A protein has these predicted regions:
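Juxtamembrane transmembrane-helix boundary motif
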Residues: 1-40, 60-148, 158-164, 168-170, ...
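Transmembrane helix-bundle signature of multi-pass membrane transporters/permeases
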Residues: 44-52, 172-180, 238
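Central hydrophobic cores of alpha-helical transmembrane segments in multi-pass inner-membrane proteins
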Residues: 54-56
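Generic hydrophobic alpha-helical segments
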Residues: 59-60, 187
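Accessory recognition modules or surfaces
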Residues: 130, 180-184
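Extracytoplasmic gate region of multi-pass secondary transporters
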Residues: 154-155
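Feature detects amphipathic, helix-rich regulatory segments
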Residues: 173-175, 185-189
Length: 248
């Protein structure tokens, strides 16, 4: 019962953080596997199912607030869907520790780049939608890495989009939309792999409701945060997360 309460609370908090900044989803598989000793397939199945909910609810709220560039998001997501399909397969071939090291190195560099980068007048989404092939490749690579490592997507995608010149709130909206197309093939693949684990399917509806509530509340309040402050929060959080995972 204690484990269930902790899982519900974690999904509420992580959902809220995802709604606000786009990041924190990686905490779910880390908690499930690291603290509860869940099998890898079960922890990833529960995590990516939650990421699907956060992606849908978060995207809707960010779209309503005018912070979702569908053109960029659609191109990126097309690449991510294909990449995620490959990522689930890669997870079975490459040691998970290796994939996590790759992920957090990229997160670390992205966070540092955001802190060092200075905003320029007129820096808008126009810079980011110029190259369709670039965003297809970016989506494929990030989708594969995230699906294989257990990260939902925004923790890697959001800092990169911000680095490319996309406003912070819009970058969160795009990364949440993109996470839907990482989560669909990933959740399906890992749920199939965990088909023999009845506990997963009993926990799923309760945890998804808790996660959804957190995301809804967080994304509703995201625009109340100053954009410059949001960038710094994401950058510092990304650096801290990466350093903890890489060096501790």
């Amino acid at each position: 019962m204690l484990n269930l309460i902790l899982m519900i609370l974690l999904n509420l908090v992580v959902g809220g953080c995802i709604g606000l900044t786009g990041i924190a989803g990686f905490l779910l598989p880390m908690f499930y596997a690291g603290f509860l000793d869940m099998p890898s397939s079960a922890s990833l199945a529960l995590s990516f199912a939650a990421f699907l909910i956060s992606g849908i609810l978060g995207s809707v709220n960010y779209y309503k607030s005018g912070n979702l560039d569908l053109k960029t998001a659609s191109v990126l997501s097309a690449g991510s869907f294909v990449g995620a399909l490959a990522g689930v397969k890669i997870n079975l071939l490459i040691p998970a520790d290796t994939m996590k090291i790759i992920l957090y190195l990229v997160v670390l560099l992205s966070g540092i780049s955001i802190l060092l980068r200075k905003d320029k007048p007129g820096n808008t989404e126009k810079k980011a939608v110029q190259s369709v092939p670039f965003f297809l490749v970016l989506g494929a690579v990030t989708g594969a890495v995230c699906a294989a490592s257990g990260a939902g997507g925004p923790v890697l995608v959001m800092p990169i989009l911000t680095l490319l010149g996309i406003p912070a709130h819009t970058a969160v909206g795009i990364s949440l939309f993109d996470s839907i197309f990482i989560a669909v093939p990933s959740a399906a693949g890992y749920l199939i792999a965990a088909a023999g684990n009845k506990e997963v399917f009993l926990l799923l509806p309760v945890l998804l409701v808790a996660h959804g509530i957190g995301v809804f509340v967080g994304s509703k309040n995201a625009t109340k945060i100053n954009q410059t402050l949001l960038k710094r929060i994401v950058a510092v959080a990304s650096i801290a997360i990466a350093c903890i995972k890489l060096f501790l």
